[in-house]
C-alpha cells in the first residue's frame, strides 16, 4: 500500500493515539508514527521515508514502543486467560485463580523494576557525587581494578626464539564443511553521533507499563502513578572488537584475529592459567546477573558496555547475551544483524520479533559490502611469500594433512597470480572472471576448494602465518637496527584472511554474485602489480536477507532518502505480495516559503547543460557553469555547496576554471557585463566573492569542514566543491548558514560500460524475465479447463500469443534494469540535496544543473518534498522555464525575503 497515493486505500487515518512523544508532534510525525504502529500490528513490511530534520528517528521509537507496550498488554491478558477457557471449575474459583496468577505476574514485573530502579538511583547518586568533587569520571564510581589475565604472551607478541607457538595443531577432519566463514566487516562503525545522542535522550522518558493499569486501584498518588510507567530496557550489542576487555586480545589488529584468539582461549586444550579470566562460567554466574541488571537499568552506548564489563570484571561480549531476552530494544550494527551466523553466535532469534532498520537507504550496499571482497595482485604476491616462508620453515615439522593443505593454498595463490598477470598484459581494463580459467594453473582446479576453505577457517593457518611473519620481521628489525626504539607499525590488512574470503566467494552460486578483474587507470608506461585486482561483487542480496524476512513478525526500513522505492520491493522482497508492503513518503516540516528548488537547464548565455559522459569535456559548458556559479555566489549569502558526479570530473572543472580568461565571451566577462575580469581565472573571480574549499580523497572531512564553517562564521561566506558519493555527501549536515544553496551538477549515473555494471544490469534483467515468465505461465494455466486443455479458440493463437508474451516480458525486464540504474543515480541526488535543510526553521535553495532534470522520469524519482518544490517554482514562473535571468531574480528575492525574516 503506497501511502503517498490520493486514493482512499492509501490514506492514513490519524486516530490521535497517544504515542508518548516528548514534544508536540507535527502532523507528518503523527502520520509517520501511526504508519509504524499499523505496520507492526498487521505484521507487514514498511518502507518509510521522512526527510532529515523531521524527527524521523524519534517518531520511529515512539511509534514502535507504543505498539510494543500495547502488544505486551494484550499478551499479558492472553496469558491470564490461558488454561481457563474450557475449565469446568466454578466461576468464583476461576476468578480467584486468575487473580493469583495476575498477582504473581505483576509481582515479578514490579520486582524487576524495583531492582533496576535501585541501580538507577545508585548510579545517579554516584554521578552527582563525582561531579560534585570535580572528578571527570561520569560513568560511575571508582572502578574495580581488573586483574591480569593470567595469560602468556600472545602469538606474535614476543621476539623470543621459541617458534613452536606458530606450529599448526594436527589436522584430522575431512568431514563436511561447518560454519559460515563469512567475512565480517564494518564492526568499527556502530552508531552515528546523532543516534547515540537520541539513545541517551530516551532514558529521560518512560512508556506505560505493559501491565493493565486497572490492576492498581490503590495507587493514587502522583508517585504511585509514575510507578505505573516503566523505563525502557535497551541493550546495545557489538562485536568482540568493540567489547573485548582482555588487553592481550583486543590489541590485535583485525576483527578476525580477535575472534580467533578469543575462541582459542576457550578451547579445552588451552591450559587453565592461559584461559581468559573474564569469560562467564559457573563460578561467576552472579557477575553475569549483575552485568545484565546494570546493562538494562539505564540507556547505554557500546562504550558504556565495555566500561561496565571492566568494572564488574566480566566479559561484556558474552555477558550481554543474558540481557537479550528481557530487553525491549536491541540495537546492533549491520554485520551482526544481516549475517545469520553472527545472529546465531550472539543467541539472537528474530522469530516473532520486529526488525527496524534506520538509515536504510544504504541497506543493499551494506549487504553487498559484507559478502563482497577483493584482493590485488600485490596482495596475492605477499600472501604467496608469507605462505612460502612459513612452509620452508616448518615443512619438516608439519604433520600429515597440514603439509598437504598449506601446499594446496600456495598452489591456489599461484594460479590466481598467473591469471591476473596474464590479464595485466591484455588490453581489457576490466571483465568477468571465468572460474575455470582462474584455477587452471598449477593444477589448482583439482583441489577441493570446500575442504581447503574449511581447513583455512578451522586450523587458524592465516593467524599462524601472519603472526610468524610479524615475528620474523621483528627479529630482523631488532638485529639490523639495534638502537632504534621505534616500533614498526603493524599491518592493518590481514592478507591471508582476505584470501580466505576470496576463496569463499568462489564457492558462491553465479546467480548470487560475480567475480571480476579490474585494472586501475595509470599513465605509467610499466604497469604495477597494484593496478589489477580480483573483486567479488554480490549481485543478489535477497537470499542473505531472506532469513530475516521469513523470521521477523514485521520489518520497517526507514530513511530520509528512500525514494525511489521500487528497488527495495523488487530486490529485497521479491516474494512478498504487494498488499503486504506499505510505503510512505512524508513531506518536510518546513513551510513552503523556506525552499527554493529549480532545475537549471541552461546558463546566462543560453548554453544548455547536459552533462553526459560524452559532454563532460565540453569547455563551453564548463565556462557556462562558471558564469552560473558567479551569479549564484553573488546572490546567495553564507555557504554554497556544489556536488559533482565524480572526483575526476571535479578535477577537470577545476583545471578549466584555473585557465585565465581572454575577456570577450569568457565566463567572467559575460557574467559581469564588463571587461573587469579580463585575464583572471574563474577560480580567482569566484574567490573574490567567497573563499573556495574543495573535497579531496586525501584531506580529512573534519579539516575541510572546520575551515569552511570558520569562513562562514567570519562573515566571508564560502563555496564548497564536493563529490556525489564522496565524504561530504552523506552524514554531514549543511544546516543553516552552512548550506544556503545546494547545487547538483549533472546526473551522477554510474558508468554502465564497466564489466561490473554490465553484469549487474544483466542480472536485474534476467531476474525480471524469470519472475515475469513464471507469472505468465501461472496465468496461462488458469485459462485451461479442468482437463488441462486450452479454452476454445486459444489454441490457434497460441504461437502468436507466446511471441507477444516473450516480447512483453523482455521489454518489461529491460525497463526494470533501466529503472534500477536510474534509481541508483537519483537516490544519490536525493541524499546530497537532503544535506541542506535540517530543521523546521532552516531554509535553502536547491539548483539541479542539467536539462535532463526536466524529464518526467527523472523528476518523478526526486524525493517528494524536492519534487513539489521544483514543480511549485515552475508553476509560479520562478523556475527555469522563465529563463536564467528570471530564475536568478526569483532566487535573489527568496534569499532576501528569508534574511529579512531572520
Curated annotation (Swiss-Prot):
GO molecular function, one term: ATP hydrolysis activity
Binding site for [4Fe-4S] cluster: 244, 262, 276, 315
Positions contributing to ATP binding: 50-57
Span of domain Helicase ATP-binding: 15-414
Biological processes, Gene Ontology terms: establishment of sister chromatid cohesion; nucleobase-containing compound metabolic process
Subcellular location: Nucleus
Short motif DEAH box, span: 358-361
Cofactor(s) needed: [4Fe-4S] cluster
Catalysed reactions, as listed in the record: Couples ATP hydrolysis with the unwinding of duplex DNA at the replication fork by translocating in the 5'-3' direction. This creates two antiparallel DNA single strands (ssDNA). The leading ssDNA polymer is the template for DNA polymerase III holoenzyme which synthesizes a continuous strand; ATP + H2O = ADP + phosphate + H(+)
GO cellular component: nucleus
E.C. number(s) listed in UniProt: 5.6.2.3
InterPro entries recorded: ATP-dep_Helicase_C, DinG/Rad3-like, Helic_SF1/SF2_ATP-bd_DinG/Rad3, Helicase-like_DEXD_c2, P-loop_NTPase, RAD3-like_helicase_DEAD, Rad3/Chl1-like
Cofactor binding remark: Binds 1 [4Fe-4S] cluster.
Record-linked NCBIfam families: rad3
Name of the protein this chain belongs to: ATP-dependent DNA helicase CHL1
Lineage: Eukaryota, Fungi, Dikarya, Ascomycota, Pezizomycotina
Amino acid at each position: 500500500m503506497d501511502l503517498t497515493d490520493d486514493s482512499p486505500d492509501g490514506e492514513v487515518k490519524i486516530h490521535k493515539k497517544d504515542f508518548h512523544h516528548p514534544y508536540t508532534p507535527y502532523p507528518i510525525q503523527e502520520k509517520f508514527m501511526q504508519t509504524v504502529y499499523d505496520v507492526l500490528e498487521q505484521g507487514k513490511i514498511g518502507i518509510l521515508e521522512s526527510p532529515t530534520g523531521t524527527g524521523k528517528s524519534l517518531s520511529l521509537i515512539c511509534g514502535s514502543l507504543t505498539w510494543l507496550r500495547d502488544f505486551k498488554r494484550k499478551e499479558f491478558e492472553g496469558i491470564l486467560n490461558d488454561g481457563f477457557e474450557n475449565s469446568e471449575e466454578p466461576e468464583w474459583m476461576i476468578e480467584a485463580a486468575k487473580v493469583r496468577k495476575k498477582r504473581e505476574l505483576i509481582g515479578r514485573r514490579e520486582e524487576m523494576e524495583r531492582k533496576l530502579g535501585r541501580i538507577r538511583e545508585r548510579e545517579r547518586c554516584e554521578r552527582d557525587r563525582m561531579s560534585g568533587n570535580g572528578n571527570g569520571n561520569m560513568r560511575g564510581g571508582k572502578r574495580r581494578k581488573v586483574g591480569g589475565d593470567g595469560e602468556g604472551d600472545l602469538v606474535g607478541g614476543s621476539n623470543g626464539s621459541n617458534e613452536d607457538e606458530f606450529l599448526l595443531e594436527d589436522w584430522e577432519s575431512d568431514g563436511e564443511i561447518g560454519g559460515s566463514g563469512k567475512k565480517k566487516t564494518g564492526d568499527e562503525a556502530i552508531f552515528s553521533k546523532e543516534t547515540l545522542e537520541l539513545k541517551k535522550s530516551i532514558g529521560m522518558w518512560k512508556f506505560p507499563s505493559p501491565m493493565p493499569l486497572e490492576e492498581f486501584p490503590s495507587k493514587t498518588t502522583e508517585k504511585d502513578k509514575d510507578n505505573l510507567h516503566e523505563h525502557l530496557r535497551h541493550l546495545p550489542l557489538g562485536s568482540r572488537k568493540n567489547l573485548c576487555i582482555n588487553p592481550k586480545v583486543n590489541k590485535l589488529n583485525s576483527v578476525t584475529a580477535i575472534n580467533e584468539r578469543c575462541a582459542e582461549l576457550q578451547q579445552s586444550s588451552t591450559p587453565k592459567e592461559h584461559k581468559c579470566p573474564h569469560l562467564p562460567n559457573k563460578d561467576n554466574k552472579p557477575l553475569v546477573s549483575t552485568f545484565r541488571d546494570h546493562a538494562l537499568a539505564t540507556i547505554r552506548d557500546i562504550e558504556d558496555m565495555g566500561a561496565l564489563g571492566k568494572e564488574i570484571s566480566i566479559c561484556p561480549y558474552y555477558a550481554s547475551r543474558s540481557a537479550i531476552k528481557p530487553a525491549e530494544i536491541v540495537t546492533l550494527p549491520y554485520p551482526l544483524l544481516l549475517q545469520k551466523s553472527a545472529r546465531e553466535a550472539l543467541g539472537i532469534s528474530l522469530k516473532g520479533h520486529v526488525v527496524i532498520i534506520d538509515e536504510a537507504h544504504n541497506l543493499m550496499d551494506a549487504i553487498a559490502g559484507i559478502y563482497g571482497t577483493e584482493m590485488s595482485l600485490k596482495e596475492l604476491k605477499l600472501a604467496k611469500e608469507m605462505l612460502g616462508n612459513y612452509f620452508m620453515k616448518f615443512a619438516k615439522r608439519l604433520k600429515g594433512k597440514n603439509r598437504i593443505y598449506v601446499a594446496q593454498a600456495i598452489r591456489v595463490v599461484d594460479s590466481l597470480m598467473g591469471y591476473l598477470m596474464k590479464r595485466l598484459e591484455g588490453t581489457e581494463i576490466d571483465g568477468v572472471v571465468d572460474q575455470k580459467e582462474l584455477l587452471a594453473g598449477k593444477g589448482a582446479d583439482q583441489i577441493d576448494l570446500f575442504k581447503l576453505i574449511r581447513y583455512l577457517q578451522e586450523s587458524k593457518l592465516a593467524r599462524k602465518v601472519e603472526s610468524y611473519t610479524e615475528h620474523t620481521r621483528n627479529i630482523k628489525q631488532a638485529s639490523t637496527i639495534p638502537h632504534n626504539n621505534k616500533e614498526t607499525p603493524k599491518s592493518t590488512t590481514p592478507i591471508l584472511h582476505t584470501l580466505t574470503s576470496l576463496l569463499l566467494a568462489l564457492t558462491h552460486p553465479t546467480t548470487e554474485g560475480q567475480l571480476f578483474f579490474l585494472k586501475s587507470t595509470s599513465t605509467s608506461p610499466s604497469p604495477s602489480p597494484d593496478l589489477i585486482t580480483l573483486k567479488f561483487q554480490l549481485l543478489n542480496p535477497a537470499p542473505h536477507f531472506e532469513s530475516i524476512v521469513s523470521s521477523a513478525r514485521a520489518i520497517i526500513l526507514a530513511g530520509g532518502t528512500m525514494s525511489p522505492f521500487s528497488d527495495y520491493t523488487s530486490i529485497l522482497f521479491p516474494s512478498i505480495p504487494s498488499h503486504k508492503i506499505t510505503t510512505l513518503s512524508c513531506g518536510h516540516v518546513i513551510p513552503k516559503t523556506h525552499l527554493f528548488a529549480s532545475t537549471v537547464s541552461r546558463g546566462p548565455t543560453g548554453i544548455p547543460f547536459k552533462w553526459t559522459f560524452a559532454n563532460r569535456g565540453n569547455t563551453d559548458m564548463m565556462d557556462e557553469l562558471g558564469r552560473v556559479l558567479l551569479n549564484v555566489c553573488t546572490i546567495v549569502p553564507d555557504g554554497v555547496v556544489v556536488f559533482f558526479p565524480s572526483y575526476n570530473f571535479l578535477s577537470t572543472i577545476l583545471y578549466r576554471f584555473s585557465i585565465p580568461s581572454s575577456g570577450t565571451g569568457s565566463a567572467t566577462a559575460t557574467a559581469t557585463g564588463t571587461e573587469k575580469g579580463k585575464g583572471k581565472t574563474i577560480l580567482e573571480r569566484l574567490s573574490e566573492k567567497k573563499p573556495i574549499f574543495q573535497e579531496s580523497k586525501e584531506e580529512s572531512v573534519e579539516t575541510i569542514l572546520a575551515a569552511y564553517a570558520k569562513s562562514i562564521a567570519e562573515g566571508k561566506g564560502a563555496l564548497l566543491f564536493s563529490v556525489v558519493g564522496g565524504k561530504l555527501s552523506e552524514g554531514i549536515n549543511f544546516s543553516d548558514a552552512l548550506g544556503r544553496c545546494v547545487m547538483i551538477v549533472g546526473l551522477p549515473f554510474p558508468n554502465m560500460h564497466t564489466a561490473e555494471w554490465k553484469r549487474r544490469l544483466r542480472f536485474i534483467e534476467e531476474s525480471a524475465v524469470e519472475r515475469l515468465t513464471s507469472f505468465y505461465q501461472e496465468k496461462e494455466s488458469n485459462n485451461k479447463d479442468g482437463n488441462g486443455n486450452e479454452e476454445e479458440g486459444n489454441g490457434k493463437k497460441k504461437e502468436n500469443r507466446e511471441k507477444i508474451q516473450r516480447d512483453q516480458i523482455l521489454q518489461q525486464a529491460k525497463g526494470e534494469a533501466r529503472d534500477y540504474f536510474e534509481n541508483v543515480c537519483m537516490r544519490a541526488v536525493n541524499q546530497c540535496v537532503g544535506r541542506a535543510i535540517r530543521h523546521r526553521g532552516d531554509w535553502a535553495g536547491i539548483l539541479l544543473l542539467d536539462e535532463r532534470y526536466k524529464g518526467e522520469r527523472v523528476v518523478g524519482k526526486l524525493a517528494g518534498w524536492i519534487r513539489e518544490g521544483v514543480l511549485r517554482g515552475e508553476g509560479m514562473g520562478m523556475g527555469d522555464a522563465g529563463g536564467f535571468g528570471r530564475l536568478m531574480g526569483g532566487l535573489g528575492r527568496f534569499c532576501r525575503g528569508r534574511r529579512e525574516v531572520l
